[in-house]
Amino acid sequence: MNKLNKQIFGTLFFSIFAAVTGVGIVVPLLPVYAHDLGASGLYVGFIFGAFSLSRTFFLPYFGRLSDLKGRKPFIVPGFLAYALISVAFVYSNSVDSLIVIRFFHGIASAMLMPVIQAYIGDITPKGREGITMGMFNSSLFLGLSLGPLIGGTLKDHISLQGS
């Protein structure tokens, strides 16, 4: 991998790590907040399921669009949408709004993952695909590991409203 592609990989690695860590922070906080808003267990399931459902349907769509239009036009807008939608959690005051926010968060996530993975495939030299994708996925799962620990710590040591 040449120097520019290493920089691109590093940027994508840390960007995904940060984004997924943020999602992971929400995991232990969201059910508590939803319960405080009056959500039953079923509605907590809807809140979490909305993210995965929208992501499932939009992953192939954004993957295909990036095949047609290139990878770069989706990455920055995808991260921007992801960040802005994340801020919406702070202003959510109903169970229904949490479901809607999670639905759109899933769409923003779908705008990122297949595009970034394809971009990494594009810049990876032949014969290095496995190690490169393994390293990239380690950023994803490290974020999924650390995020809930951070969120749980926030929940235990700071009021939920402060989190």
What spans do the regions from the language model cover?
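Pair of pore-lining "gating" transmembrane helices in MFS-fold secondary transporters
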Residues: 5-28
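Membrane-interface helix caps of multi-pass secondary transporters
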Residues: 29-38
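Juxtamembrane helix-start elements in MFS-like secondary transporters
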Residues: 40-48, 133
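Residue-level signature of mid-helix packing/kink "hotspots" within the transmembrane helices
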Residues: 52-60, 144-145
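Conserved MFS/SLC helix-loop-helix module at the cytosolic interface between two early adjacent transmembrane helices
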Residues: 57-93
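Paired small-residue
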Residues: 85, 96-104
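Cytoplasmic helix-loop-helix junction between adjacent transmembrane helices
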Residues: 101-140
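Helix-loop-helix hairpin linking two adjacent transmembrane segments in secondary transporters
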Residues: 136-163
